[in-house]
Amino acid sequence: MAEKPVCTAQVNVSCVSQSNSCISIVGSNNSNSVPVLFCFSVFARPSSVPHGSGYEVLIQKFLSLYGDQIDMHRKFVVQLFAEEWGQYIDLPKGFIISERCKIRLVPLQIQLTTLGNLTPASTVFFCCDMQERFRPAIKYFGDIISVGQRLLQGARILGIPVIVTEQYPKGLGGTVQELDLTGVKLVLPKTKFSMVLPEVEAALAELPGVRSVVLFGVETHVCIQQTALDLIGRGVEVHIVADATSSRSMMDRMFALERLARNGIIITTSEAILLQLVADKDHPKFKEIQNLIKASAPESGLLSKV
């Protein structure tokens, strides 16, 4: 005798147009526990949930079964295998389970390969931890400060928002005086290495057209790297300014930039960024940007360590 299919549930959609909460999986199983096959990626694990469980319970069950394999920074859709259609179908948050079934958690795709185009209206600058106490330890610190100031001036000229963080300023001091923070959107203290703080996420949410972040500061292999990975995990395109980014160790810097480039992050220079943002010599701000970049960026030795 053939085994009964894992999921023979029918989906009751008679009142979908009126309310998502009307959707349920209809069956005759009245026990307190319903067997469910939880599928994620190439894996499938049988388990059970209480009768009448909905979206939140299922998400927690996926997390308990698959743990660190699920990147909660991404967006997902929960799908039910419908025997009627012979395939998975999307379910809204209001559905409840009352019969054994097979469900899966599907991550929505994030495009990691990008063309790297920049426009002032879709870009934010992130200045990371350019603080006085780091001056003696960071290689070519004076040079990256000079380039950082060029970027901040360019942001003011082009009307690009700037977010600045300071790592534990109580102990490490504030941003160096050479950097003019006039007009920046936020200056935030932090203890977390990544710049992607709740306040930063809220600020980005207020700028719905933003799709790119230009990132510079210290240290390349710590705060810059973790910020870049957090941003790209949220679907934001990241441009790291190589001539405005450094570490205490050039080996750490080199391997961090190599890793980030492999993950779809764009490694670029300050001049390339500024000219890409104006894009045309007829841009009304081109002359100001041209004057800004006439003084060449320092030949600091960072190039040989990229």
UniProtKB/Swiss-Prot annotation:
Gene3D superfamilies recorded for this chain? Isochorismatase-like
Name the gene that codes for it. Answer: isoc1
One Gene Ontology cellular component term attached to this UniProt record is: cytoplasm
UniProt protein name: Isochorismatase domain-containing protein 1
- Which CDD domains has this protein been placed in? YcaC_related
Record InterPro entries: Isochorismatase-like_dom, Isochorismatase-like_sf, Isochorismatase_domain
**Family designation:** Belongs to the isochorismatase family.
Output the Pfam families linked to this UniProt entry.
Answer: Isochorismatase
Membrane-spanning residues: none
